[in-house]
Amino acid sequence: MPTIAPLSSPPQSQEQLLAQARQLAGYSLGELAALAGIPIPRDLKRDKGWTGILLELWLGASAGSKPEQDFAALGVELKTIPIDSRGRPLETTFVCVAPLTGNSGVTWESSHVRHKLQRVLWIPVEGERTIPLAARRVGAPLLWSPDEDEERQLRMDWEELMDLIVLGEVERITARHGEVLQLRPKAANSKALTEAIGAHGETILTLPRGFYLKKNFTAALLARHFLLQHD
């Protein structure tokens, strides 16, 4: 394989970003960590975001966990996605934190979810636990925007979930709500509470919630992409 190096500054175009991502395909996480000079944890139990941080470093990402996209100047969000040996996602994909108050007048068009999913660079990574972290390989990238049907599905779920939040029913929402988008607690510990609207319009304290793409949505997206690649 030719020698590769992390981008020293943010990519100037989507084409440059995709070209760099394609160069990473086939490398293991251990190889990429060694080439970048960063330590590799033994597993991801305490370093769940490590894979994403490693790939952000290689791709010159700038945003970190701020509200704008990882490649804000290009309008592109980076999503690493752990897959099994058949290329299927192993977990749901975090999109963004859900606003539980101050939602009057909010629309799908102006939502964080739509903003984050307008243009996504998907990078599949081997994720089966039987494969040591350092040996897991990076797959071929996909630069994606939702088509009309995908956007319609996302919008319908987002509107249903936001209606429940505004109506004070956030505590009733389960991971089963939504066809392709779900809302569920996002907190490292159950003491981190945030304000929300209660059933009678009062302010309540509840766990922060996050929007996640369900596996059926990302599985279909990846399957279409890789079938096209293999034609």
Swiss-Prot record:
Keyword terms, alphabetized: Cytoplasm, DNA damage, DNA repair, Endonuclease, Hydrolase, Nuclease
SUPFAM superfamilies: Restriction endonuclease-like (SSF52980)
Protein origin, superkingdom: Bacteria
Pfam family, one: MutH
SMART domains: MutH
CDD domains per the UniProt record, alphabetical: MutH-like (cd00583)
Localisation per UniProt entry: Cytoplasm
Classification via InterPro entries: DNA_mismatch_repair_MutH, DNA_rep_MutH/RE_typeII_Sau3AI, DNA_rep_MutH/T2_RE_sf, Restrct_endonuc-II-like
Zinc listed as a keyword: no
Keyword Nucleotide-binding attributed: no
Main location, first listed in the record: cytoplasm
Gene Ontology MF terms: DNA binding; endonuclease activity
GO CC, alphabetical: cytoplasm
Gene3D superfamilies with a match to the protein in the record: DNA mismatch repair MutH/Restriction endonuclease, type II
GO aspect biological process, one term: DNA modification
Job of this protein: Sequence-specific endonuclease that cleaves unmethylated GATC sequences. It is involved in DNA mismatch repair.
Family: Belongs to the MutH family.
Name assigned to this protein: DNA mismatch repair protein MutH
Organism: Klebsiella pneumoniae (strain 342)
Lineage, top ranks: Bacteria, Pseudomonadati, Pseudomonadota, Gammaproteobacteria, Enterobacterales
